[in-house]
Amino acid sequence: MHESSFYRITIDNKSFIVEFDNPNNKTLMVVNNISLEGKTVLVTGAAGFIGSNLVKRLFNDVKNIKVIGIDSITDYYDVNIKYERLKEIEAIAEGLIHDDSCSMENPWQFVHASIADKEAVEKIFTENKITVVVNLAAQAGVRYSITNPDAYIQSNLIGFYNILEACRHHEVEHLVYASSSSVYGSNKKVPYSTDDKVDNPVSLYAATKKSNELMAHAYSKLYNIPSTGLRFFTVYGPAGRPDMAYFGFTNKLVKGETIKIFNYGNCKRDFTYVDDIVEGVVRIVQHAPEKQNGEDGLPIPPYKVYNIGNNSPENLLDFVTILQEELVRAGVLPNDYDFEAHKELVPMQPGDVPVTYADTTPLEQDFGFKPNTSLREGLRRFAEWYARYYEN
């Protein structure tokens, strides 16, 4: 992948980043810049898979930053993994306190609460000057939404409304929030583009994520809140969610149980490694949609939506084969493991779709970035983490 060249310029007292996104054609991209230096960032879902990796990345990239994390730590999956993630964050933050280059007295603050708790959310905003909000808190899982709808209404709708209201009353420079590739529903056209219609969700989870995009657009229009929605595609990696296929399959294979491969293996997923997701989030967080007025003098909503995916869907059977090979390589499974005896091909489950495939052209054009971690490399890192974590 080519290296981009960035230059900071100032026009009419506004700071911009100018990027040559390709040294061969010298195409220019100009986007607003938000400096995170000396600022406070709120990350919701901070004990979650993406949230915890984002917090660690922010501390790695910006020495003088305060990050406030909020998470309800539900038992939707093993809470020990969530506490382990928080422990890693706390260790990094403790190191920053003793770093002479860090002027923040307390760079990390964790709030154990749900974003559906309006008072808890308001308290965070009242007591802190929040610059950027990254809303990653949500009840995840397509299949779980079929049997447990209440959890999705509370976290994904009421919780997101509370975040929007807080951003409305306490001016923030940028609201970035997690949407999902599931909003594309049963769309037949691939790759999925953010220009496609997404009016026919096939699960309640997808419906709540589409609702988030609509709510954010309304608040951007009414209250001029710069917001960016991110449609994530099948995120995986070390210390991930045990309910995801790669993690769940591994747990079952280790126990000698049979794994169910849906749609008889005729599924394709745009598996996206967590570090690539975080890279996209970090770039987008610092570049808010510009506030401007239209020809009628009324504000144009400072609102954007991007896909973050690998732009390379993998067949589920190929995915399982690579996972098995890497689990053997890492010593999680023995060399003579009988994989065929532990596979069962079953029909498609309600709420699932046969293919996910991200068109990442806007992400590449606006930020010069495209996820590029191969599935084998990503699953190798997961397998190595799994071997270490469960050995201990």
Spans of model-derived segments:
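C-terminal substrate-binding subdomain of Rossmann-fold SDR/epimerase-dehydratase oxidoreductases
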Residues: 2-9, 14, 20-29, 34, ...
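The catalytic Tyr-centered alpha-helix of NAD(P)H-dependent dehydrogenases
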Residues: 201-208, 232, 238, 242-246, ...
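N-terminal Rossmann-like NAD(P)+-binding domain of SDR-like oxidoreductases, especially those catalyzing
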Residues: 2-235, 314, 322
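Generic alpha-helical secondary structure signal
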Residues: 132, 214, 244-248, 318, ...
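Residue-level recognition of oxygen-bearing side chains
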Residues: 120, 151, 158, 197, ...
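Residues at alpha-helix caps and immediate loop-helix transition turns in enzyme cores, especially N-
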Residues: 54, 81-85, 241-245, 319, ...
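A glycine/serine/threonine-rich, flexible loop-to-helix segment
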Residues: 190-191, 242-250
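Solvent-exposed, non-membrane alpha-helical residues enriched in polar/charged side chains
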Residues: 122, 126, 164, 217, ...
